[in-house]
């Protein structure tokens, strides 16, 4: 089939292209001829596009036809695939609100024979036609055109004329998207061919001035903007491609076209993938069955600036700039507001453009020619920055397209690195099913829970569950929807109201919204990890997600206004939203239009979101991947900028040295084939591709449904889960090459090498991670610069230091991982899975699951949602599960909730807002009593325990001291570079050669870079980690030790961390005790009697099994401690174990005095007291309740103990059942009360008191009741007036509000795992360096979030230990104080080492500058001499200081008692922790300046003595060099004279120096000469004098150089 008017287009195409060519350079003539040859084969494919481009270009150049003859212009074909055609209506209907006449156009078109379907897409301005399969397209489209033209003529007579409309989006179906990169790639091939041919045939190359002129135009943003205003984007791209290719070919430069060819190839593959997705999704997106979005005219700021009239119609608000097509061509554009903000690449491009112009001007002013100026321009080309960004975006775009995502605007992927705010619209979080948000019963038999479960069943099309005995049947139930009135009726809120009607009677009301999408949790977790501010616009049902975001806005907030304000206040915005039938679409589409990156989910039943940049599928999985690309895009762009900066620096240095060196270089030079700029660009391109590939290889997020299983009837839960079990989660597939290599490694020949090769591979991987150190790029550039100027030894030194540092760090990482693996090794958990027989109905299947006796033992890892598991004490729950059967079931959830007491579980549904969720079992909890059957609802990362951990799974690990050193380097590096520049400038003033001057300057600059900093940081942390490990603290992440030295807030989990998670009897209180009397000791006779009776009522262990309940164990243990033997006076007859429904345990027995049998009861006071008799009921009951309340306020769990005579027959204890006991348990005699509490660790209170005394803020976080939490806090040493906040107070708070609350709170009670993360994050936002100490799975996420995560070993959860940076391996929490002291010590060591490294280098720079000024124009020390100085003064002395402890612990005295030794240790810890906070700021700068001044003074004095005494210049330089070393070594000795290692290192370095200086051959190699007695006397005098000044007059030095004297640490 053919599309009309696509034949013979060559002449028109060439004419349009010629207009563009005339606007560019004449040097592109060859490329134009190439385009003419290519025109014919691509014409049929590209003609509709090229025709529009030609018209646009003609208007831009002042030629072409007037646009005001729409009734004589055929509507152009914008896209076709043979059967579906898009006709552009813009030229035909040039008046506003034309979309209101869509029906007038559609009806006549549909009646044309051969047209199967036809409709107008108003947002696109297109007539979309689907042809019959057998229709002749030429004939049909001809008739369509005739009909449309006639209709347009009629409508034009009545419509108000205005400027034409344009398409509001970048058309992925546009063939130009492929034609443009294809054309540019062909031009690059031609340029490559020309360059290689010219070099092979030795044709003369034109001056590089031509290439520089092309680069200047191509990389000057202002020039590009000017061309775009005249030629349009397409014309500008063509013109620049031609000029660049022609210039590269004529100058025989291979690198530029080769790199551009690679980049164009990526763009071509991206465009092809986008077009493929467009072809697949267009029938569904542009379907006539979908509702049309409202079209609103807007004023575009870009249209006002363009020469041709340009208007924009889109779903937006008046006066809002949106997408624009300049001049009506297919330039496709981007909203000008979107392009107005700059990311790292755009900012650098601007500065590089200005810098290259300044460099070129400087070259001309310095007497250089045009070639030198051209070289300066080419050295400043930011090619690497562009390449990295384009490579990342193109690779990511192709991957998204391959996954089926439609990218309407590829420019959005280029803006990912700019995003500062992520706005998530609650409409995008809407699931597929309706959900009950609130249920209210108003009739007997219809409580809230019953209304909820019946309504939920109706919404899901299920049969309502059978009623309980006290509930009414739901026969004939239906929902009657009630329209909302007033402001709450805003559709965007997503809330509707309905009445539940049964047999015509309204029995309750419900608020109905939508379920939350299963990918909502992964989406919010990923957004949290992007580093951008996350904002959530709520819809009904998303309120529980507030804690995961930075700010929230209520339902009904205008999305357009919100996005606009955030863009203005905080920067570029990425918006994730969706258009739904019951949501306001105009506001959503408008917000998508102005968002910098608009991502919209596609709802096939709603309007197509054409204003989005990216249209995903119907779920959030693709949006999760896009969000995960944000930090990677930012990192890739920053890396590209750094590469560009390094390439420019090296290219400029190469330019200077080459111009000063030989001119006889071969045509194949680094400058032409492999220049630093091109090398950096190639590296950036590869890095961009690799970074994007990592994003695309990320596994798909795991759905985490938030269904309220606890509120549903078991039958409903079983029907939704059973029979539809999900497949097991599998790891991402292993690549074929990796699998083949793995198979090959098991062969007989290679199997012996498998283990060592694996170790080497792991070491290589760990070493590669260490190369990510922030100082690595700086040192790499320095090494390359040294090599360029001929200082190969310095280059090798720097490279060697980098390698040694990375290997050392890698080894430590592997050691830590191995130790952690050994510590955390676990056995595979086994669980009994119930085999459910196949039966007909859901109810019968549920009954079979509840009563089936056959089970199979399987691995917990193989469980899936829908499996039924069987559990009994003391097993651990392997997954989240809904209880189906509960027999006296009690569960220990302390590792999850922090609640130290067991909780009762039951089968009945609980209220949807009930935080206890008593019908659920959660992974990690332990069964302490009873038996359970439960159906699995979530496994793996979908469980509640793992959900909190995964929320911070990828939180950036503390950068350690490296980050602080990077800040220091950023301050010092400019000074060292300035020193190198000063040496070069002074040398030139003294008429030194350019090459020599530059070499001296580079040598100084490189030598002044503290290349030992990374190694110092690594080894100091390693040494501190080893010292801590010896004290019982395993350091898994050495980088966090630096944060230990700065910690000012420590958060403690209570249960299992500060306590042993084991109940003990605190007191036994007789009933006669007054409420406020001091608690008696259990050894008191009256208290012992109460404890004895409580023990008699406790269930005794049987058959060697453990105690059934933790309370029984605690009471029996306490009772046995008072009696060395069993209570022989009590003969047990029968017992009734505790059951939650009864609330007490009972026992029947006979005492030794032969009295009648007694019934002993022990249970909750609210169950026991009503059964007791009192002489004065009113007063006695008030007294009892007051006493119970007083005990509870002490943080105790209170049990009441009572007794009475048993008057029944006891000959057959089988007849003594629970019902008989319950009937007899009246008129009881109240004996007293038992108070139980969790057992505190012996080291807890001393630790808390020491931390508080040292000025640390201690925060207690627990799942206990607020009253219990307050009491425990006081017992542990916190203030009695400490504020206690309930976890419910945190619900709904955004990040800012939570930070404000957390600033002055010391105790948090009843908190969930997610809220623990919220608390830690809030403290961090308050500027506090936070540590988190915990032992449970509920602590793991907070441990990972904290600056320092500390796990407590022992009974604790492996999840907590696995998330921790430091693991305490024994029960002594006092090791934490040692860790804090070690952190301080490491900081002090690093500070002194940095003083040696940086301060010594500063002194070297100052000495070199002085020597250059007063010498012969050359630096007094050369490259090799500076190498010697760095080796002797920087590396080994600095390392010895870094690995030794600053604070000496008090020595052991054989005459000291243990108490005296502990007191001395505590005093030492207090002195260290109460000192000033370690800092690398003012105190360090003072020490650096002092050392630099003293070093320079000593070296300069010795050098001056050498000049004033007879001798050669080499002797003088040697004296200065020697004093330079000895002055620094003397200061090092003074810093740590108590350390044998430092003393030995300093003396050893001095000995090596003397040996090198005095050995003739070696001395000459280093540019020195042996010194005589007079020279040595001068050196010693200078060294001693300078050192004496630093010791005797430090304050004078501070004042002389403007450094404020601060308190010494």
Swiss-Prot record:
Active site: 1053 (4-aspartylphosphate intermediate)
Superkingdom in the source lineage: Bacteria
Family annotation (InterPro entries): ATPase_P-typ_cation-transptr_C, ATPase_P-typ_cyto_dom_N, ATPase_P-typ_P_site, ATPase_P-typ_TM_dom_sf, ATPase_P-typ_transduc_dom_A_sf, HAD-like_sf, HAD_sf, P_typ_ATPase
Catalytic activity: ATP + H2O = ADP + phosphate + H(+)
PROSITE patterns in UniProt: ATPASE_E1_E2
Key words of the record: ATP-binding, Cell membrane, Magnesium, Membrane, Metal-binding, Nucleotide-binding, Phosphoprotein, Translocase, Transmembrane, Transmembrane helix
Residues annotated to bind Mg(2+): 1335, 1339
Pfam families found in the cross-reference section: Cation_ATPase_C, E1-E2_ATPase, Hydrolase
GO cellular component: intracellular membrane-bounded organelle; plasma membrane
Cell compartment(s), UniProt: Cell membrane
Protein's membrane topology: Multi-pass membrane protein
Main location: membrane
TM spans (from-to): 30-50, 176-196, 238-258, 357-377, 641-661, 673-693, 778-798, 921-941, 969-989, 997-1017, 1396-1416, 1426-1446, 1542-1562, 1573-1593
Biased segments, Acidic residues type: 1449-1462
Enzyme class: translocase
Annotated stretches, region: Disordered: 1447-1476
EC identifiers of the protein: 7.2.2.-
Gene3D superfamilies: Calcium-transporting ATPase, cytoplasmic domain N, Calcium-transporting ATPase, cytoplasmic transduction domain A, Calcium-transporting ATPase, transmembrane domain, HAD superfamily/HAD-like
One term of GO molecular function: ATP hydrolysis activity
Family to which the UniProt record says this protein belongs: Belongs to the cation transport ATPase (P-type) (TC 3.A.3) family.
Protein name: Probable cation-transporting ATPase I
Provenance organism: Mycobacterium leprae (strain TN)
Chain's gene name: ctpI
């Amino acid at each position: 089939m053919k599309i009309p008017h696509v034949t013979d287009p060559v002449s028109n195409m060439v004419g349009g292209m010629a207009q563009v060519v005339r606007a560019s350079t004449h040097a592109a003539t060859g490329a134009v001829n190439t385009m003419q040859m290519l025109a014919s084969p691509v014409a049929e494919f590209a003609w509709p596009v090229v025709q529009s481009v030609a018209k646009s270009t003609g208007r831009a150049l002042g030629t072409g036809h007037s646009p005001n003859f729409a009734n004589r212009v055929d509507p152009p074909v914008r896209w076709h695939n043979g059967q579906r055609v898009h006709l552009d209506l813009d030229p035909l209907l040039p008046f506003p609100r034309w979309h209101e006449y869509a029906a007038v156009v559609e009806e006549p078109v549909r009646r044309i024979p051969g047209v199967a379907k036809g409709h107008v897409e108003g947002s696109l301005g297109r007539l979309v036609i689907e042809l019959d399969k057998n229709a002749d397209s030429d004939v049909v489209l001809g008739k369509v055109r005739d009909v449309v033209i006639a209709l347009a003529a009629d409508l034009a007579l009545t419509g108000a004329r205005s400027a034409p409309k344009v398409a509001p989006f970048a058309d992925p179906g546009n063939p130009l998207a492929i034609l443009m990169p294809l054309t540019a790639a062909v031009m690059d091939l031609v340029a490559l061919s020309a360059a290689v041919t010219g070099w092979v045939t030795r044709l003369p190359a034109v001056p590089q001035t031509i290439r520089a002129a092309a680069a200047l135009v191509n990389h000057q943003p202002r020039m590009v903007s000017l061309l775009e205003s005249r030629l349009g984007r397409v014309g500008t791209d063509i013109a620049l491609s031609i000029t660049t290719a022609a210039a590269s070919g004529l100058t025989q430069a291979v690198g530029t076209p080769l790199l551009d060819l690679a980049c164009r190839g990526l763009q071509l593959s991206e465009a092809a993938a986008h077009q493929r997705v467009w072809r697949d999704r267009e029938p569904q997106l542009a379907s006539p069955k979908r509702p049309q979005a409202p079209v609103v005219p807007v004023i575009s700021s870009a249209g006002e600036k363009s020469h041709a009239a340009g208007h924009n119609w889109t779903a937006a608000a008046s006066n809002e700039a949106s997408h624009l097509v300049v001049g009506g061509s297919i330039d496709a554009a981007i909203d000008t507001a979107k392009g107005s903000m700059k990311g790292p690449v755009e900012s650098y491009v601007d500065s590089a453009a200005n810098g290259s112009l300044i460099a070129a001007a400087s070259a001309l002013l310095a007497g250089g020619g045009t070639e030198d100026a051209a070289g300066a321009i080419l050295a400043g080309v930011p090619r690497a920055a562009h390449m990295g960004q384009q490579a990342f975006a193109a690779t990511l775009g192709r991957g998204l397209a391959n996954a089926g995502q439609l990218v309407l605007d590829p420019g959005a992927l280029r803006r990912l690195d700019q995003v500062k705010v992520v706005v998530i619209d609650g409409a995008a979080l809407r699931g597929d099913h309706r959900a009950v948000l609130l249920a209210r019963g108003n009739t007997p038999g219809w409580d809230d829970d019953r209304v909820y479960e019946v309504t939920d069943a109706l919404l899901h099309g299920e049969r309502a569950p059978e009623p309980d005995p006290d509930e009414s049947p739901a026969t004939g139930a239906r929902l009657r929807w009630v329209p909302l009135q007033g402001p709450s009726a805003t559709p965007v809120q997503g809330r509707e109201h309905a009445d539940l009607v049964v047999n015509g009677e309204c029995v309750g009301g419900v608020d109905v919204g939508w379920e939350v999408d299963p990918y909502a949790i992964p989406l919010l977790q990923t957004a949290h990890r992007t580093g951008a501010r996350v904002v959530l616009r709520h819809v009904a049902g998303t309120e529980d997600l507030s804690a995961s975001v930075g700010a929230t806005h209520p339902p009904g907030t205008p999305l357009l206004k919100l996005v606009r304000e955030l863009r203005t206040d905080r920067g570029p915005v990425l918006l994730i939203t969706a258009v739904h039938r019951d949501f306001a679409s105009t506001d959503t589409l408008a917000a998508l239009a102005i968002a910098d990156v608009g991502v919209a989910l596609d709802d096939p039943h709603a309007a197509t979101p054409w204003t989005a940049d990216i249209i995903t599928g119907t779920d959030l999985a693709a949006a999760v991947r896009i969000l995960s690309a944000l930090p990677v895009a930012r990192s890739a762009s920053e890396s590209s900028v750094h590469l560009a900066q390094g390439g420019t620096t090296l290219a400029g240095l190469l330019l200077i040295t080459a111009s000063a060196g030989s001119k006889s270089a071969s045509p194949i030079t680094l400058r032409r084939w492999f220049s630093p700029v091109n090398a950096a660009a190639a590296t950036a391109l590869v890095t961009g591709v690799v970074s994007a590939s990592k994003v695309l290889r990320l596994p798909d997020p795991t759905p985490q449904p938030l269904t309220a299983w606890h509120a549903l009837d078991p039958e409903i839960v079983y029907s939704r889960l059973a029979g539809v079990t999900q497949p097991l989660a599998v790891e991402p597939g292993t690549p074929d090459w990796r699998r083949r290599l793995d198979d090959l490694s098991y062969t007989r020949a290679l199997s012996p090498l498998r283990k060592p090769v694996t170790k080497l591979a792991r070491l290589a991987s760990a070493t590669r991670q260490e190369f990510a150190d922030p100082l690595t790029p700086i040192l790499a550039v320095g090494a390359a610069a040294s090599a360029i100027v001929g200082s190969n030894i310095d280059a090798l030194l720097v490279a060697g230091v980098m390698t040694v540092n990375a290997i050392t760090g890698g080894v430590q990482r592997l050691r830590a991982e191995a130790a952690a693996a050994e510590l955390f090794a676990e056995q595979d958990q086994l669980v009994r899975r119930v085999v459910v027989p196949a039966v007909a109905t859901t109810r019968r299947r549920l009954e079979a699951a509840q009563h089936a006796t056959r089970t199979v033992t399987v691995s917990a890892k193989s469980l899936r949602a829908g499996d039924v598991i069987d559990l009994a004490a003391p097993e651990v729950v392997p997954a989240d599960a809904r209880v189906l059967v509960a027999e006296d079931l009690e569960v220990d959830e302390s590792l999850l909730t922090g609640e130290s007491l067991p909780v009762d579980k039951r089968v009945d549904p609980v209220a949807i807002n009930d935080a206890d969720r008593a019908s659920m079992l959660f992974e990690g909890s332990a069964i302490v009593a009873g038996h359970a059957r439960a159906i699995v609802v979530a496994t793996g990362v979908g469980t509640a325990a793992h959900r909190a951990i995964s929320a911070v799974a990828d939180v950036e690990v503390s950068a350690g001291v490296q980050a602080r050193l990077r800040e220091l380097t950023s301050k010092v590096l400019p000074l060292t570079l300035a020193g190198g520049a000063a040496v070069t400038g002074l040398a030139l003033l003294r008429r030194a050669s350019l090459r020599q001057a530059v070499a001296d300057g580079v040598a100084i600059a490189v030598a002044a870079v503290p290349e030992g900093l990374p190694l110092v940081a690594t080894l100091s942390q390693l040494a501190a980690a080893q010292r801590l490990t010896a004290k019982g603290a395993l350091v898994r992440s050495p980088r966090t030790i630096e944060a230990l030295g700065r910690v000012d807030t420590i958060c403690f989990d209570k249960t299992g961390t500060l306590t042993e998670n084991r109940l003990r009897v605190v007191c036994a209180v007789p009933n006669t005790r007054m409420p406020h009397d001091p608690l008696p000791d259990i050894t008191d006779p009256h208290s012992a009697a109460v404890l004895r009776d409580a023990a008699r009522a406790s269930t005794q262990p049987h058959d060697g099994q453990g105690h059934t309940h933790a309370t029984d164990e605690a009471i029996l243990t306490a009772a046995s401690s008072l009696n060395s033997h069993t209570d022989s006076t009590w003969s047990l007859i029968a017992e009734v174990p505790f059951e939650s429904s009864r609330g007490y345990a009972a026992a029947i027995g006979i005492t030794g005095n032969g009295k009648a049998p007694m019934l002993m009861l022990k249970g909750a006071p609210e169950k026991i007291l009503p059964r007791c008799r009192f002489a004065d009921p009113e007063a006695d009951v008030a007294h009892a309740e007051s006493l119970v309340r007083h005990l509870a306020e002490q943080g105790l769990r209170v049990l009441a103990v009572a007794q009475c005579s048993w008057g029944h027959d006891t000959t057959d204890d089988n007849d003594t059942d629970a019902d008989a006991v319950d009937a007899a348990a009246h008129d009881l005699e109240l004996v007293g009360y038992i108070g139980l509490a969790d057992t505190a660790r012996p080291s807890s209170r001393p630790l808390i008191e020491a931390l508080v005394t040292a000025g640390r803020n201690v925060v207690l976080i627990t799942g206990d009741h607020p009253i219990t939490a307050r009491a425990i806090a006081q017992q542990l040493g916190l203030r009695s007036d400490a504020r206690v906040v309930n976890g419910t107070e945190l619900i709904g708070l955004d990040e800012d509000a939570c930070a404000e609350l957390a600033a002055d709170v010391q105790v948090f009670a009843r908190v969930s795992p997610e809220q623990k993360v919220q608390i830690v994050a809030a403290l961090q936002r308050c500027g506090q360096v936070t540590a988190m100490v915990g032992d449970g799975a509920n602590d793991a996420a907070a441990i990972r979030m904290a600056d320092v995560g500390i796990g407590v070993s022992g009974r604790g959860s492996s999840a907590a230990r696995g998330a921790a940076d430091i693991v305490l391996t024994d029960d002594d929490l006092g090791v934490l104080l040692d860790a804090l002291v070690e952190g301080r010590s490491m900081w002090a060591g690093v500070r002194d080492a940095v003083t040696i490294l940086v301060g010594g280098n500063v002194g070297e720079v100052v000495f070199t500058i002085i020597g250059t000024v007063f010498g012969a124009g050359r630096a007094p020390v050369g490259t090799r001499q500076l190498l010697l100085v760095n080796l002797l003064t920087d590396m080994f002395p600095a390392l010895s200081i870094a690995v030794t402890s600053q604070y000496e612990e008090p020595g052991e005295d054989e005459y000291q008692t243990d108490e005296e030794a502990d007191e001395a240790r505590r005093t030492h810890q207090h002195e260290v922790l109460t000192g000033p906070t370690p800092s690398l700021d003012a105190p360090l700068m003072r020490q650096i300046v002092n050392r630099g001044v003293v070093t320079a003074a000593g070296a300069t004095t010795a050098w001056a003595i050498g000049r004033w005494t007879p001798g050669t210049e080499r002797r003088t330089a040697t004296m200065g060099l020697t004093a330079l070393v000895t002055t620094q070594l003397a200061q090092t000795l003074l810093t740590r004279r108590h350390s044998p290692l430092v003393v030995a290192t300093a003396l050893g370095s001095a000995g090596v120096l003397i040996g090198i200086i005095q050995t003739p051959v070696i001395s000459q190699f280093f540019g020195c000469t042996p010194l005589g007695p007079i020279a040595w006397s001068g050196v010693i005098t200078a060294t001693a004098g300078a050192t004496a000044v630093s010791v005797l007059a430090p304050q004078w030095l501070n004042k002389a150089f403007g450094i404020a004297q601060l308190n010494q640490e």
